[in-house]
Amino acid sequence: GARLAPFDIAELREIMSYDEMELDKIGDRKTALFLIMSDTDTTFNFVIAMLQSQLFNLLCDKADDEYGGRLPVHVRVIADEFANIGQIPQFDKLIATIRSREISASIILQSQSQLKAMYKDSADTILGNCDTTLFLGGKEKTTLKEMSELLGKETIDLYNTSETRSNQKSFGLNYQKTGKQLMTEDEIAVMDGGKCILQIRGARPFFSDKYDITKHKNYRLLADENEKNRYKVEKELNPQYTPKSEEEVEVIHVELSE
């Protein structure tokens, strides 16, 4: 059928024919696994969705069967452009159970409507299982409305004065307390680009400055700081990779005794 058409590609069949990932061992030791997909072609997104589904299920089973319910090493999944990965089967149920196994997930979206388009009625369940919500800015109406409602209301003092000018001059003052949205939708929409809103379950929301990544002690190790730090996949794919003229390479001399 059409859904299996990608498997007509020999390279994909080769990748899927055997296991080199050892996903079940990620919770045993510190591991960094990067899943990189095209942001313009969604043909192979289902592969990453399948991998993540297997990852969650394998780690949950291993936590239960071998470690008494919790993995020895915390596993954090940072799912950037989550809506473009493809639908992960039963994710609304997985996200409710993984935390007890020492697994967490950070879902990164352009707007909440992306999640609802992908997961339909299950989107609210997924959002409800996220203890922390970090809003970096945007102007999508549904997201703005939900953020405003999430922040809640504040109490303000309202004074009304009235004055009548006639033969008998009168003056009136009315005082009352009323509720107002902590931040209205239009206030959130025009929020300064250097600000963010952080909501943690059980705590009042924070209106804060975004962290300046250039001040991080390890920023110097990123390719943004120095191009020579950029990971070159060609080196892994081609053992006889020849560095380009502008690349800096480290030469190590090893003397072998006879």
Regions found by a protein language model. Give the residues of each.
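Conserved ATP-driven motor cores of ASCE-family P-loop NTPases powering translocation/secretion/packaging/pilus
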Residues: 95-197
